[in-house]
Amino acid sequence: MKPPDRLHFTESDEANRLLATDGLALLIGMLLDQQFPMERAFFGPQLLKDRLGEDLDAERIAAWDLAGLEEIFKGPPAIHRYPASMAKRTQDLCAVLVDEYEGKVSNLWETARDGADLLKRLKALPGFGEGKSRIFVGVLGKRMGVRPEGWEEAAADWPSIADVATFDDVFTLRERKKLMKKAKAESGG
C-alpha cells in the first residue's frame, strides 16, 4: 500500500498533507489527541511547524527551551487545551526519539520486529498508553501502509481516528464514540 498524500483528519489541506508526509507530525498529532477535539489535535503539528518557522525536527524540539516551547503552544490560538503540559510532553516525546531512535520517527516503526514490538515501543513513549498506542498502530497500518507482521492484532479493535478516510468521518466517529460512552455508562461499565 502506498501512503496517501493527505490524511483527512483536519479541515486544513496543508495540515492534512503534513500529517501524511511527516511521521513526527502524525505522532505529535496522536499525542495531542486527548481532552481536545480530534481535528484540532491533529492540526496542532501544523501550528507548531508554522510557529517554529521550519520543518518539525525531534532534535530541535527536544533541545528547545521549555518556557519558550510553552509560549509557542499557548498561541493564540493554543495548540492544545493544556498548552504547558502538552509542550512538555511533546518535548519529552522528541527526547525519546532522539535518544532511542536517532531522532528519526520512522525508525520507531521501520525497525520494529512485528506488530507486538511496535505496540510495545509506542507504549513506552511519553503520553502513549495502551489505547492510544493501539490506535496509532491502526493509523499506521490502515492509513500509512506500515504493516509489520501481526499489526492487525496489535491495532485498536474499536472505532478510532484510524478509520477516518474523509473529514466528514471525524464527525461520524465523534458521534459513535459518544454513543459507545453512553452505552457503557448505562450498562454500569
PLM regions and their residue ranges:
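Structural motif
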Residues: 14-25, 36-37, 80-85
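Alpha-helical ds-nucleic-acid-binding substructure associated with the helix-hairpin-helix region
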Residues: 48, 52-124
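C-terminal accessory module of base-excision DNA glycosylases/AP lyases that mediates lesion recognition
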Residues: 1-16, 21, 113-124, 130-189
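Short, aromatic/basic-rich helix-turn unit that serves as a nucleic-acid recognition element
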Residues: 27-31
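Short helix-capping/linker segments at secondary-structure and domain boundaries
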Residues: 34-43, 97-103, 144-148
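Amphipathic alpha-helical interaction segments
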Residues: 26, 43, 47, 88-92, ...
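Short acidic alpha-helix initiation/capping motifs at coil-to-helix transition points
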Residues: 20-23, 38-41, 48, 112-114
